Amino acid sequence: MYLEHFGLREFPFSITPDTEFFFSTGVSQEALNTLLIAARTGEGFIKITGEVGTGKSMLCRKLMASLSSDFKVAYIPNPYLDPDSLFMELAAELEIEFDADTIAKHQALRAIKERLLMLHNSGKRIVVCLDEAQAMPIETLEALRLLSNLETEKRKLLQVIIFGQPELEDKLNHPSIRQLKQRIAFEYCLAPMGRDEIDYYIQHRLSVAGHQGTRMFTRPALWLLKLRTHCVPRLVNIVAHKALLSSYGRGRKNVTFWDVNAAVNDTASLRDFGTKFRLAFLLVMLLGSVLLLLIDKGYFR
């Protein structure tokens, strides 16, 4: 591939969340600070929402890496769980051993509470992180509320952080789980990066991957990258990776406007926007030509 060609140790624009590549934008740092403060308070639910590709999974991984050894984190990435399966997953994360085929739900819940009390007495705080929560069944979200009832006289035994797309809000408005929504103490909505942050984001990821040379992406390339990806981190990564492949295929050491354009045209989710952009550009050019012709003919004298 292009690693040796560009002097890189690893791929700089992988879409797999890797906290070594975490880039602190104004939005992501504020969200991380909110999560860290909320986790230390130990009260209620925490909700993080954002459109596809805005960095929810990366933020979740960064949070888990940032929590001190006082915390025990249970990470549940699979949202398609019924309540019983949720309890089994949580038990596995908490290192509780029992026969999942024979134990009843109330017994599993009791075993979880006993384990939580033991961890609490040893000075541990428990944080449960659930990804893609918008896909969770209503009854599983209600089971989460039941878990949040586990507490001592002074504090909750576990903190629940749910990450999801904006549709999660619609699900939380369901009448049967209105009590869960009332328990959300902190929430934050992730937005795409700012246009002025993309240049630094690209350079940051290249540097982490081992690049030590001069600017690799030309200014026209960055301009088109911002325009076509709307500064959504996942789309930026996908297009930047393909643009590097294009540059490598042409035997160059930098990424040009045309490399980004080729990358965009190779990305299905951006093709429709590209077609609309070209049609709009042609329409503007046509209207401009007609206007100049009318001026030349003296229609505006």
Question: Model-found features: residue ranges?
Answer:
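A short, basic N-terminal segment
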Residues: 1-42, 289-301
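Conserved NTP-binding/hydrolysis module of P-loop NTPases
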Residues: 11, 70, 84-100
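Walker A/P-loop nucleotide-binding motif
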Residues: 42-62, 79
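Sensor-1/coupling segment of RecA-like P-loop NTPase cores
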Residues: 47-53, 104-107, 134-143, 148-176
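Residues at the beta-strand->loop junction immediately N-terminal to the Walker
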Residues: 47-49, 130, 226
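Mid-core helix/loop region of P-loop NTP-binding domains shared across ATPases and GTPases
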Residues: 82, 98-143, 152-156, 194-198, ...
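C-terminal alpha-helical "lid" subdomain
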Residues: 212-213, 218-301
